[in-house]
């Protein structure tokens, strides 16, 4: 079926038409086949007189006077005399091919009542005979003659076919128009006979109209007369549509009339219920609906919040700022639109990824107060379906999520990773703004931190609050919340999210130092001392945090941990000296005890082996006294604790020189002598290696001519880890008795014995 649906190829049509015309031209046409006697066989009115022909067995019942023939002329009825005259024409005899035709032609069997068309297929012998005769008799001249006849007759055939088609269509149109006109005339005659008075009145009105507006009246008459033609064209174009429309209209009317009693009954019941409610409410005081009451309460709370703010949010353009903008669309599904109950634009929100794969929406609090719907690429949801996860009133920041299943798919969000405030750097970020239905991107430059937020140079307008700032990886770094007050800063301000464990940052503690963060790289860094700065309260789901933010410091602790750290002293959780605080986890390698190239070079130098028993006993370590909590202290203890804190703070501010290391006490002579004796015994009992030359001469071995080699005594290598002189003789000088600093093989001391040099 697919082949019938393909468009028709014009080349195939022309090729088929050419083959058909050639086929009809090469073979004799209807009514021109002659038997050997010269009588037309197609006429069906003469008897076969000898010869072999395919028409010998054809039945020829036909009337002698009239016979119907399939001719190309204007008339289909001819007499036997016309047929005989046609057969005697010299144009009908073109050779043996036509006189002895083996092809089967239509035979019209004429009867007074009907005509039947009988077709007889030729046999293989007849086809073979005609083909051999064609090859034998046809020459080049005959082929050229037939081709020229074809070229001359083709335009006539085409014009004749077109004329016949036009005549048929004209006859059809004439019949339709005549029938329609006769029907209109019959209607007019019937109306004139039935109501002659009204008919005369209508005719007078028609004449008046025709005299006043001749063109319009004539065009209307023409349209009425040609209505059948218009109707035929309309039915040909929209016949199926008209039928379906009629069926639908019929079905609707049927269903309407069938359901009319039930619809009427329901309307009456509704009217009765409404009237009864009105009558019962007439004696009662008027009540307000819960929806309107909630709306009024929401509006009043929003007004109170706006009036209670110390620094109201302003939306204005920065004068003199001209930033080049490029046409570009933001990441799809990240920026959401916030609207009020009337569908008016309020601001924007951003979809971000939180810790543990949770999805949240970040937006300013002043945008949240006026927002009723959150619109995404796929749909919208009410703000009442969301709950707060993170809220900082000082920064006007809010993170929300919803307990509704599949709310992200309903909105069509595609969240991006969220970067906390401790990783924001002073550089340019991408800010997308919408203007006239199109999105543009600009370079928003973060120039300085201020009050826990950022000063950003960007070109914004009222209604851009909530737009996110993206970095190069399209991570959400900060959120635009408006402009600073004109008396403070002329730039815009943006807030970032503080690192809350298990919400916006990892729960594992991160220790940072000058090697990881610096003031030149980030706007804020994790603080070692959080005693100064502004205190901010962060509310999350189920717990609260206190944050101290200074000019370049951010510290985040829960309330319980904050009290514990304050009771211990001025040293905080991120202090460098972790040995004084056993509760804090150890450093991962970035600290005072981190391995450096200098320490590694010192560790590579070999040190002489000593016995640990000869080392002096370590000094007893002072026991740590547990710090008493401040809530458990007496007033005298609190005063002493305050004094200790002040002294520690002053000592920390003043530069102090590191304490000098005390030299270890030199061992006694008896200890050195005992140590030397043990070393000599150990050296004498050691067997020489097989791979090195031995001092003995091999008698029955494999190398009898080998001589002993004299070893040269090496100078001892001085130790770089201590100032104690090395052990080099038995003169009773001091030696290093400390513990081993590496696990490399130690050079054993051999007093009074020569040693050969080692090979590298």
Swiss-Prot record:
One of its GO terms (molecular function) is serine-type exopeptidase activity. Pfam families: Peptidase_S39 (PF02122). Residues 621-643 have a biased composition (Basic and acidic residues). Keywords: Hydrolase, Membrane, Protease, RNA-binding, Serine protease, Signal, Transmembrane, Transmembrane helix. Its EC number is 3.4.21.-. Its main location: membrane. Residues 572-672, 684-760 are annotated as: Disordered. This is Protein P1.
């Amino acid at each position: 079926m697919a082949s019938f649906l393909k468009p028709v190829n014009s080349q195939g049509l022309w090729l088929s038409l050419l083959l058909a015309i050639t086929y009809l031209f090469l073979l004799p046409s209807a009514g021109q086949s002659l038997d050997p006697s010269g009588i037309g066989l197609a006429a069906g009115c003469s008897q076969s007189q000898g010869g072999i022909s395919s028409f010998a067995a054809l039945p020829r019942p036909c009337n002698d006077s009239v016979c119907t023939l399939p001719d190309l002329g204007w008339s289909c009825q001819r007499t036997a005399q016309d047929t005989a005259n046609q057969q005697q024409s010299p144009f009908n005899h073109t050779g043996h091919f036509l006189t002895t035709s083996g092809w089967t032609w239509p035979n019209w069997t004429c009867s007074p009542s009907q005509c039947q068309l009988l077709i007889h297929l030729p046999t293989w012998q007849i086809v073979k005979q005609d083909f051999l005769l064609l090859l034998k008799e046809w020459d080049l001249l005959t082929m050229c003659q037939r081709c020229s006849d074809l070229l001359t007759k083709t335009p006539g055939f085409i014009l004749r076919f077109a004329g016949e088609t036009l005549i048929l269509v004209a006859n059809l149109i004439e019949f339709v128009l005549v029938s329609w006109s006769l029907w209109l005339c019959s209607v007019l005659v019937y109306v004139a006979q039935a109501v002659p008075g009204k008919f005369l009145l209508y005719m007078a009105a028609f004449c008046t109209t025709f005299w006043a507006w001749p063109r319009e009246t004539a065009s209307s008459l023409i349209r009425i007369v040609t209505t059948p033609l218009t109707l035929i064209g309309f039915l040909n174009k929209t016949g199926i549509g008209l039928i379906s429309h009629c069926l639908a209209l019929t079905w609707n009317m049927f269903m309407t009339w069938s359901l009319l009693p039930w619809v009427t009954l329901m309307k009456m019941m509704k009217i009765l219920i409404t009237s009864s409610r009105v009558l019962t409410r007439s004696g009662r005081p008027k009540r307000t609906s819960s929806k309107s009451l909630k709306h009024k309460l929401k509006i009043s709370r929003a007004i109170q919040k706006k009036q209670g703010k110390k620094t109201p949010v302003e939306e204005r353009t920065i004068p003199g700022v001209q930033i080049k903008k490029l046409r570009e669309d933001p990441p799809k599904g990240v920026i959401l639109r916030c609207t009020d109950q009337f569908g008016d634009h309020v601001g924007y929100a951003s979809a971000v990824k939180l810790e543990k794969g949770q999805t949240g929406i970040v937006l300013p609090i002043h945008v949240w107060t006026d927002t009723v719907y959150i619109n995404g690429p796929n749909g919208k949801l009410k703000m009442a379906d969301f709950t707060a996860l993170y809220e900082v009133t000082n920064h006007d920041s809010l993170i929300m999520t919803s307990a509704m299943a599949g709310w992200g798919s309903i909105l069509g969000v595609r969240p991006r990773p969220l970067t906390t405030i401790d990783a924001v750097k002073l550089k340019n970020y991408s800010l997308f703004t919408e203007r006239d239905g199109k999105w543009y991107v600009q370079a928003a430059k973060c120039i300085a931190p201020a009050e826990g937020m950022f000063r950003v140079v960007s070109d914004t307008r009222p209604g851009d609050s909530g737009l996110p700032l993206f970095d190069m990886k399209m991570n959400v770094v900060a959120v635009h919340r408006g402009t600073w007050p004109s008396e403070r800063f002329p730039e815009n301000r943006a807030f970032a999210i503080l690192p809350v464990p298990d919400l916006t940052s990892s729960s594992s503690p991160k220790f940072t130092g000058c090697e990881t963060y610096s003031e030149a790289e980030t706007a804020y860094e994790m603080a070692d001392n959080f005693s100064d700065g502004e205190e901010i309260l962060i509310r999350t789901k189920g717990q609260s945090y206190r944050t101290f933010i200074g000019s370049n410091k951010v510290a985040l602790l829960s309330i319980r941990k904050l009290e514990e750290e304050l009771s211990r002293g001025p040293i905080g959780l991120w202090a460098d000296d972790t040995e004084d605080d056993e509760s804090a986890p150890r450093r991962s390698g970035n600290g005072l005890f981190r391995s450096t190239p200098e320490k590694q070079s010192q560790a590579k130098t070999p040190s002489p082996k000593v016995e640990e028993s000869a080392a002096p006993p370590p000094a007893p370590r002072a026991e740590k006294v547990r710090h008493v909590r401040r809530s458990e202290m007496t007033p005298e203890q609190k005063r002493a604790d305050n004094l200790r804190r002040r002294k520690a703070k002053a000592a920390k501010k003043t530069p102090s020189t590191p304490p000098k290391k005390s030299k270890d006490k030199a061992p006694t002579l008896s200890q050195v002598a005992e140590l030397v004796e043990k070393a000599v015994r150990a050296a004498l009992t050691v067997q020489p290696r097989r791979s090195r030359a031995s001092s003995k001469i091999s008698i029955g071995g494999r190398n009898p001519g080998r001589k002993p080699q004299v070893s040269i005594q090496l100078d001892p290598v001085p130790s770089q880890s201590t100032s104690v002189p090395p052990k080099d003789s038995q003169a009773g000088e001091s030696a290093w008795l400390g513990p081993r600093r590496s696990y490399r093989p130690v050079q054993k001391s051999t007093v009074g014995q020569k040693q050969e040099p080692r090979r590298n």
